[in-house]
Amino acid sequence: IMAYSPCINHGIKAGMGKSQEETRLAVASGYWPLYRYNPALKAEGKNPFILDSKAPDGTLREFLRGEVRYAALEKTFPEEAKRLHDRLEQEILEHYEHLKRLADPMSICEEAQDKELPVGKTA
């Protein structure tokens, strides 16, 4: 089991009593996607990878600002923090799309069919 476990060193601004809310924000923002892998499903002919998370909801910055370890960067180096947060947001979206493809391998085939080149053309 891999889990997001807020701790005192994260510096949750709302306090450790709000760690469940912080965890919810981590998941909703896409910072910590929820998924399961059950190899026993493979023997049943099923996909062993199950994505439980919904698409990131755009609350990444809210999540990051709620923890001192991330908020300190924004306070000290706002331009660099913005650049890094923008990059992280993009990477989270790309990672979520990757997880969606793992959860639905047929979508990979459909994407490939959509991108097929006309007869006689090569990439």
Could you describe each region identified by the protein language model?
Residues M2-R83, R87, K100, E116, ...:
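Glycine/aspartate-rich loop-and-adjacent alpha/beta segment that forms the canonical ThDP
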Residues D104-A123:
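Histidine-centered catalytic/metal-binding microenvironments
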